[in-house]
Amino acid sequence: MYQTLTITSAQGPLSYDPSPGTFMHSAASSPVYVPTSRVGSMLTSISYLQGTGASQGAHSVNSHWSQATSESSSFNNSSPHTSSRYHYPPSPPMHNGSTRDTGYSSSLTVSSRDQYTPLARSLNGSYGSHYTPYMAPQLTSAWPAGPFDNTMLHSLQSRGAPISVRGAPGDVLDELPESRECVNCGSVQTPLWRRDGTGHFLCNACGLYSKMNGLSRPLIKPQKRVPSSRRIGLACANCHTSTTTLWRRNTEGEPVCNACGLYMKLHGVPRPLAMKKEGIQTRKRKPKTLNKSKSSSSNGNSSHQISMTPTSTTSSTNSDDCIKNGSPSQNTTPVVASSLMSTQQTESTSPNSNTLKYTGQDGLYSAVSLSSASEVAASVRQDSWCALALA
């Protein structure tokens, strides 16, 4: 993926211009080389630095460079041949720096095993191996190879725009719900994910609590109150039982069960241990609805048992009731008796006469009947204690 300075065995043509015009001085005095205007010409091939006396050959130049199959074919010192691009023989190599030239050539010469390394590639941008590369779509060349190919151009060519493999971190979290975590309680599993005001994830419980109360949900659950009948370590000071419906305290402040506390309250002495029972005895209370129905039925029966026949006992009781309720004097009793007798006689003599009854007082005044309106007015005037009858 990244270019190195490793050069494959397929070497390019000679990278210098051996014409006499390129030297600053004459060739006999000092052979100082002046580089040409090409950028990567010095990096493509420095094969003339070999320490041998024979001149180095150059490969033929095509539109692209082909990789050599063996090292011996590309570096053949015994058979010099000229380049097809330049029509003049190459300059002889320098003999005065053989030791230094050998060090340079050893670092830049590629062995036969280096041509199959994954980082080595030819100048045309393709790999030497005949296997199909799996990263080929990302390393495709941006422009086709030309006759001016070199290492510098290919190093710039391979640096294209990186291919985005995955999106932003927020999108990845949305696609992977198991990676979410509640910022309040730390839960990773919830039937519904919610968000707080800042956009952080909350579980369903914390989100609802925050929405309803406006506060963060408390992390510590409140301890449930232990029932009084099952409090750990609590026992009756008298019978030593630990099960009761109600805990009480004796005069000394010690906890006692309901039975011992009631016994001490009623009798003033501690409850004897012989009365202790394993189970809790409760009373069988009758429902209150049955008691109400019975009382209403008894009241109805008593009201229907009142006799409607006019007798002296009823008249006397009625007169007694009137006297107790606030009669002005005791002289009204014979007046009431005489009026009742006169009404009974008129009923027996004239049965077809008009009768007047007071509604709502049939039980008390069922025998009172007057024949005319004048008698009604006279009776009302005489009986001052019956002023409520006009209401």
UniProtKB/Swiss-Prot annotation:
Q: Where in the cell is it found?
A: Nucleus
What the entry lists under Gene3D superfamilies is as follows: Erythroid Transcription Factor GATA-1, subunit A
Polar residues composition bias: which ranges?
Answer: 96-111, 326-355
Q: Where are the zinc fingers (GATA-type)?
A: 182-206, 236-260
Highest taxon listed in the record's lineage? Eukaryota
Name the Pfam families for this protein.
GATA (PF00320), GATA-N (PF05349)
Kindly state the tissue distribution recorded for this protein: In embryos, expressed in the presumptive heart mesoderm. In adults, expressed at high levels in heart, small intestine, and stomach and at lower levels in lung, pancreas and colon.
Alphabetized SMART domains for the sequence: ZnF_GATA (SM00401)
Which example biological process does GO assign this protein? positive regulation of transcription by RNA polymerase II
InterPro entries reported for this sequence: GATA_N, TF_GATA_4/5/6, Transcription_factor_GATA, Znf_GATA, Znf_NHR/GATA
* Biased composition regions of type Low complexity, renumbered to the chain: 66-83, 292-319
Q: According to its UniProt record, where is this protein mainly located?
A: nucleus
* Region named Disordered: 57-111, 274-355
Cellular component GO terms, alphabetically? nucleus
| UniProt keyword annotations, A-Z | Activator, DNA-binding, Metal-binding, Nucleus, Repeat, Transcription, Transcription regulation, Zinc, Zinc-finger
List the biased-composition ranges (Basic residues). Answer: 282-291
Write one Gene Ontology MF term.
Answer: zinc ion binding
Role noted for this protein: Transcriptional activator that binds 5'-GATA-3'-containing motifs within gene promoters. Regulates cardiac-specific transcription during embryogenesis and thereby cardiogenesis.
What name does this protein carry? Answer: GATA-binding factor 6-A
Its taxonomic placement starts with: Eukaryota, Metazoa, Chordata, Craniata, Vertebrata
